[in-house]
Amino acid sequence: MDRMFGTDGVRGIANTELTAQMAYNLGRAGAYVLTEGAHKPKILVAKDTRISGDMLESALVAGILSVGAEAVILGVVPTPAVAYLTREYNADAGVMISASHNPVEYNGIKFFNNKGYKLSDELEDGIQKVIESDFEGVPSPIGIDLGRERIEVAALEDYTEFAKQTIPYNLKGMKIALDCANGASYKSAVKAFRDLGADVFVINDNPDGTNINKNCGSTHPEELMDYVVKKGCDLGFAFDGDADRCLAVDENGKLINGDFILMLCANYLKEIGKLKDDTLVVTVMSNLGLDIACRGLGIKLEKTKVGDRYVLEEMTKDNYVLGGEQSGHVIFLDYNTTGDGLVTALQVASIVKKKEKTLSELCSVMKELPQVLVNATVPNDKKNIYLEDAEIVEAIKEIEAKLNGVGRVLIRPSGTEPLVRVMLEGENQVEIDEMAHGLANLILSKI
C-alpha cells in the first residue's frame, strides 16, 4: 500500500478517497498507537466547517471509542486550537478534521501527540501498519470498557482567551478587517480582536458547509484587499479554512505575505532581545528578498524543506522561537506548537500599534524579487518525472544559466495534491513568467 500520510496528515476527496471507513480505521489505529499503555486515554477531536466534517467526525470517533478511549468533541475550532488544547487539557492526543486551504470537496485527518506536535513519520507509519495488519493485536473491549464521547463546550473560549494573552496590551483605536474564509476562525478571530478593543470589520464569516475557502480567505484575498481600503482600515487579515495560517493586507490594500510577516516579527523580536540567536527559520520557497532584508537587519536564516512540519523540526532542534512559510504558516514556538493564524494576526497588529507606524512603512525594509509559481497537474505516480527526464533536466540548467545567479528555479511536488509546483525568481517579471510556464508545459508534455 502507498503511504497514507502526506505532508499534513491524510487528505483526499471526502467520501471517495477519504471515506467513513478510512476515518474509522484511522480513529481506531491512531487511538491504539498514540495511547498504548494509557488507562482510559483521552483524545480531542475537532473539525472545520466543511459539510463532510460531520460524517468523518462520527466515523473517527467510533474508531476511537472502539479501543476504549474517551473522545472529547471540541466542535468547530481552528487547527492550532487542537494543538494548544491537547496540552492544556492533558489529553493523550488530538485530531483535526480539515483540508486546510483546499476546496470543500476535500477533507483531511491530522493527529497531534500529547504535547501538541504533529506526528513524526515513524508514528504515522506505525498507524498505517496497524491498519494494514487488519488491527492484529488491537483490543476490542466490551461492556463498561468501551469508550465514551463527551462535548467540551469551553473549547472555543479557552483557545480565544489563550490567543488574546499572547500580546501585552489592547488594540483600542485600531480599525481591523478580517476575512474568515467561511472557515474555522469565524468565531474566535472576531471575538479576540473585539475583546481587545479593536474596531472590527468582517467578511466571509457565515459558513454554510459548502462555502469554505470559496473565493475568499488567504487563497483568494482580493475581496479583503478592496475591503480594507473601502472601510479605511489600518490593516486586514485573511485566514485559511482551518486558520493555521494568515496573510495580512496593509492600509493601502496591498497583500503582505508570510515572508514579510516573518521579517516584521523577527525584526521586532530581535529589537526586544527575544529572537533566539537572532535566527529565523524559513523554507526554500521563501523569496530571495527575505534573505537580503534579513542580512541587512542582522538576522540569520535557517532553511528547510517545504512544509511547516519541517520548519518546526528545525525550530525544536535548536530552540528557535520563530519560523514559517511564505504561505502564511507562522510558528511562534513560545506560544504554540504549530502555525497559528490568530496568534500571528495578533502579533502583527500589536507590532503596528507599538511602533506607531503603518504596516506599509514597517514592511518597506524588504523588497521582493519577482517570483512566479505555476502549478502543473501531474498524477501522484509521475510527480518525480522532472528528476528523471533528460530534456526537463537540461531545460532547468538552461534557465539557471540565463538567470545568471540573480534568481533561481525550484520545482517541488505537492504533498497534498496531484500537482508539481514550478517556481522561478529573477529580476525580470515577464521573462521568468515565460520561463515558468514553458517549464510547466514541458513537464505536462511528458505525462
Swiss-Prot record:
EC code: 5.4.2.10
Cofactor(s) it depends on: Mg(2+)
Positions that bind Mg(2+): 100, 240, 242, 244
GO molecular function, one term: magnesium ion binding
PROSITE patterns: PGM_PMM (PS00710)
Example GO biological process: peptidoglycan biosynthetic process
Gene3D superfamilies to which the protein is assigned, alphabetical: Alpha-D-Glucose-1,6-Bisphosphate, subunit A, domain 3, Alpha-D-phosphohexomutase, C-terminal domain
Catalysis: reaction(s): alpha-D-glucosamine 1-phosphate = D-glucosamine 6-phosphate
Cofactor remark: Binds 1 Mg(2+) ion per subunit.
Superkingdom of origin: Bacteria
Active-site residue list: 100 (phosphoserine intermediate)
Pfam families, A to Z: PGM_PMM_I, PGM_PMM_II, PGM_PMM_III, PGM_PMM_IV
Record note on modification: Activated by phosphorylation.
Family from the record: Belongs to the phosphohexose mutase family.
Protein name: Phosphoglucosamine mutase
